[in-house]
Amino acid sequence: PNSPQWFNTGLHWAYGIEGPPQGHSFVDPETGEVGLSTSAYEHPQPHACFIQSVSDSLVGGTDSIMGLWNREALLFKYGSGTGSNFSNIRGAGEPLSGGGTSSGLLSFLKIGDRAAGAIKSGGTTRRAAKMVTLDLDHPDIEEYIDWKPTEEEKVSALVIGSAILQKHADSIMESIWSFGDDEGRFSQKTNLGLRKAMVRAINDSVPQAHIQRILDLAEQGWKGLEFESLDTDWQGEAYATVSGQNSNNSVRVPNSFMDAVKSGGEWSLYFRTERESAADEDRDPVPCKTLDAGALWDKVAYTAWACADPGVQFDTTINEWHTCPEAGKINGSNPCSEYMFLDDTACNLASINLL
C-alpha cells in the first residue's frame, strides 16, 4: 500500500491510538450515512492521491483559494498528495467585483507553495506532494512557465553573491588593517589599497550600503566580517528563500494548441471573467493577449529542459480516454499524474513486489 496506509491505517485498531478530530468524514457501514470522525485514527485518511477543485474566490468556502490551502494542509499532514487546476483564478490585472484589479495567479500560488514546504507529509521527513496545473490560455501562463527557472536563477545569484560579498569584505578589511598609519588607514586619499578594494567591490556590484557597513565596523575595531556562505543544496538556505520548489508544475495542452504550433499560427489568452461572460452571452471570448504558438511551445520546452518543469498534460487526449465523461471534464491530476480523473475525487495507490 501507499504511504497514507502505512502512516494511518490500523493504528487505532491495533494500538488504540487516537488523535483529535481533523474534519474527516466517513460512511457508516451499517446506516450508510456520512458522519464526522471523532478521532483522527479511528476512521483514518487512507487515500493516497487527491484531485481538488479551486474557485475564483479568496475566502468564503472550502473550494476558495484559502480554503484549498487548509484542505491541502490536512491531506499533507496525514501523508496524502493532492493536485489542482488553478485556471479558474483570475490573472494579473483582471477587474475585481469590489473594485481594483487582481494581483494575479502567481501571488496565490506562492502562498500555497510556502505552506506545502512547511509541512512534513505524514509527520515524517517526506515533503508534501503537490501538483499545480494551468491551462495554456490563462493570461498568466507565461509568468507561470517561467516561475520555477526564474526562482532557480535567484538561487544561483544568492550563491554567487554570498561568495562575492565575503571576498570583498575580506579584501577591504585586509587593505585597512595592513596599512601602517593608524590615522590614514580609513582614508581613501592616503590608503590607496582601500580605494582599489572598494572600486573592485563596486565593479562586482556589491551594494554601497554593504561597503559602508564594512567600513563602519572596521572603524569600530572589527578585523573581519563573516557572511553566510550559501550553496545549491536543495535543502539549503538558498532554496528555502525562493518560491516554486514545493510542487510539480504542469500545463494543460489541447490539440488546438498543437495544431497552431504545427501551422505556425497564433494562440490567444483570455481573462477568466471574459470567458465566463462570453459563455453566458453565447459568443466567442475576446482575447486579452495573442502569442505566437511556436514561441510559447519553445518556452515550455526550454523551461522543462532547464528545471524539469512544467510537465505537459495533453488535455484533449486525456479527456478522449475519460472513463466517465458524462460526470464531467478531467481538469487535473494527482502529484505524479498517474491518477487523472474528476475534481474532488481520490484514489488508493498500491504496488506489488515482483522480486
Go through the PLM ranges and name each one.
Residues 1-355:
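Extended catalytic cores of very large enzyme megasubunits
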